[in-house]
């Protein structure tokens, strides 16, 4: 179902949600960190979703083992590099990797700005090695509160030229976007793009708030948008992108089944929705699975899947010239 004549993108992909189980095992041994299992086979159920989780917060606990083993900046650099290697193996031409430096730093009190630098270095080296094009999106983990998010923002701004956009992720219900207005004002002043996790756990009002108050140009997940016809019209008219993550939304119990997923409705309504993975290592999926298995199960026709692939580049945080160059590169391959 992937059109090989078009660029393949993944623009909603958490770097810190894509730490390989083998890497968790390796780093656990290297730093003498107690893990819930001593073999790869036994570890996987602890670090990968093997069935549907009851809610988003339960799903997010599966991510914790990946960051618990980040005991050095070199470890952060390694997982960043491996993220690009994984993208190349999946056949991705362009990837936007988002990461929460405070979350990655937390378990071992690493310097947050140092984590940002390590991720930048690892991604750069990976791109040079594997020929994938990538951009970085900084995440503020709202679950840890306003002050912690300010620390993350300051660390990201210290490397502002290497960061493309700012995101807000975590407990959407407990920490609404209204708490972070000043944070996003600073991000926009820095010239960054804005994408926000919204309409995943909370309703359409969370999406409206992300757009109107935080300046969101894209929405992560946004599944609740279909509950508000005016919002759907607005998204289509204003060309605000939706970063859809099919398998993830089922695993977090955000959507009951793939057949119930709103991606098809988004596309039928003219909303610029794209196909993405979210947390591939934790979910046990890759972008190929999303196109070949999840999208057809969600009722998408071949042409709708192709449109979602086109949308992925259309709403990417790239200039028109960069998009054109990527299209030409893939077409000539």
From Swiss-Prot:
It is an enzyme of class 3 (hydrolase). The lineage of its organism: Bacteria, Pseudomonadati, Pseudomonadota, Gammaproteobacteria, Enterobacterales. It catalyses: adenosine + H2O + H(+) = inosine + NH4(+); 2'-deoxyadenosine + H2O + H(+) = 2'-deoxyinosine + NH4(+). GO terms for cellular component: cytosol. The record marks 221 as: Important for catalytic activity. Catalyzes the hydrolytic deamination of adenosine and 2-deoxyadenosine. Its EC number is 3.5.4.4. Pfam families: A_deaminase (PF00962). Zn(2+) binds at residues 12, 14, 197, 278. It comes from the Bacteria. InterPro entries: A/AMP_deam_AS, A_deaminase, A_deaminase_dom, Ado/ade_deaminase, Metal_Hydrolase. One of its GO terms (biological process) is adenosine catabolic process. The active site is at 200 (proton donor). The keyword DNA damage does not apply. Belongs to the metallo-dependent hydrolases superfamily. Adenosine and AMP deaminases family. Adenosine deaminase subfamily. Substrate binds at residues 14, 16, 170, 279. Its cofactor is Zn(2+). Binds 1 zinc ion per subunit. This is Adenosine deaminase. One of its GO terms (molecular function) is adenosine deaminase activity. The gene is add. Keywords: Hydrolase, Metal-binding, Nucleotide metabolism, Zinc.
């Amino acid at each position: 179902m992937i059109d090989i004549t078009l660029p393949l993108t993944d623009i909603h992909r958490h770097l810190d949600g894509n730490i390989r189980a083998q890497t968790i095992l390796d780093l656990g041994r290297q730093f003498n960190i107690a893990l819930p299992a001593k073999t790869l086979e036994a570890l996987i159920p602890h670090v990968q979703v093997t069935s549907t989780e009851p809610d988003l917060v339960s799903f997010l606990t599966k991510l914790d083992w990946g960051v618990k083993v980040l005991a050095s900046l070199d470890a952060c650099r390694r997982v960043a590099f491996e993220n690009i290697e994984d993208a190349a193996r999946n056949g991705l031409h362009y990837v936007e990797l988002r990461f929460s430096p405070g979350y990655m730093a937390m378990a071992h009190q690493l310097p947050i700005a140092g984590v940002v630098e390590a991720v930048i270095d690892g991604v750069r080296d990976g791109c040079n090695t594997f020929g994938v094009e990538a951009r970085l999106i900084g995440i503020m983990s709202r679950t840890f509160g306003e002050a912690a998010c300010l620390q993350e923002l300051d660390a990201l701004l210290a490397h502002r030229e290497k960061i493309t956009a700012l995101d807000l992720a975590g407990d959407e219900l407990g920490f609404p976007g209204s708490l972070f207005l000043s944070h996003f004002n600073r991000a926009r002043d820095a010239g960054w793009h804005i994408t926000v996790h919204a309409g995943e756990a909370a309703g359409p009002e969370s999406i409206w708030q992300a757009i109107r108050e935080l300046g969101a140009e894209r929405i992560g997940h946004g599944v609740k948008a279909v509950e508000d016809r005016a919002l759907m019209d607005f998204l289509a008219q204003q060309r605000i992108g939706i970063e859809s993550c099919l398998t993830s939304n089922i695993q977090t119990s955000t959507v009951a089944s793939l057949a119930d997923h709103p991606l098809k409705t988004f596309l039928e309504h003219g909303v610029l929705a794209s196909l993405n993975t979210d947390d591939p290592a934790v979910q046990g999926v890759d972008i190929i699975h999303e196109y070949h298995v999840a999208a057809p199960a969600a009722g998408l026709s071949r042409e709708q899947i192709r449109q979602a692939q086109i949308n992925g580049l259309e709403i990417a945080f790239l200039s028109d010239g960069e998009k054109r160059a990527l299209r030409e590169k893939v077409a000539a391959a």
